[in-house]
């Protein structure tokens, strides 16, 4: 995993440099769409087939995305370079690192909120506002439900974890009682 991140970093940084000169959001959409296509097992098997030319693989990838940037010369060059260097499996990691660079520029961060119960509407908005004050940055929440938490939430922002779940509290009580 660390090796993929190391190899993908220069691609993500170069792509972000290109995106800064234009529309970062549009480039973000393009790279996310390309990453989704590159995750498909059928695409990876076609890309590794010696019967399919590199130009055909590039055309296939670009045809599979909806982004208007797919006709951009720099986008075509990116895809062609990844295909030529057999780096298509890196696209999901490039997309992840691109998003991290985008978030850093915006002073934002992705937040994974795992809750025992579904969170929606005002409840989620209130929680996100509270978390933004605590973490001192704008958060982009992704909510997952895990009933094994019993109650409360576990929030992951970058490498920071805030676990206020009932399961975590019970585990800490158990540790305190058995120590």
Curated annotation (Swiss-Prot):
InterPro entries: ATP_synth_OSCP/delta_N_sf (IPR026015), ATPase_OSCP/dsu (IPR000711). It is a peripheral membrane protein. The keyword Membrane applies. It is found in: Cell inner membrane. It comes from the Bacteria. HAMAP family: ATP_synth_delta_bact (MF_01416). F-type ATPases have 2 components, F(1) - the catalytic core - and F(0) - the membrane proton channel. F(1) has five subunits: alpha(3), beta(3), gamma(1), delta(1), epsilon(1). F(0) has three main subunits: a(1), b(2) and c(10-14). The alpha and beta chains form an alternating ring which encloses part of the gamma chain. F(1) is attached to F(0) by a central stalk formed by the gamma and epsilon chains, while a peripheral stalk is formed by the delta and b chains. F(1)F(0) ATP synthase produces ATP from ADP in the presence of a proton or sodium gradient. F-type ATPases consist of two structural domains, F(1) containing the extramembraneous catalytic core and F(0) containing the membrane proton channel, linked together by a central stalk and a peripheral stalk. During catalysis, ATP synthesis in the catalytic domain of F(1) is coupled via a rotary mechanism of the central stalk subunits to proton translocation. This is ATP synthase subunit delta. It comes from Paraburkholderia phymatum (strain DSM 17167 / CIP 108236 / LMG 21445 / STM815). The lineage of its organism: Bacteria, Pseudomonadati, Pseudomonadota, Betaproteobacteria, Burkholderiales.
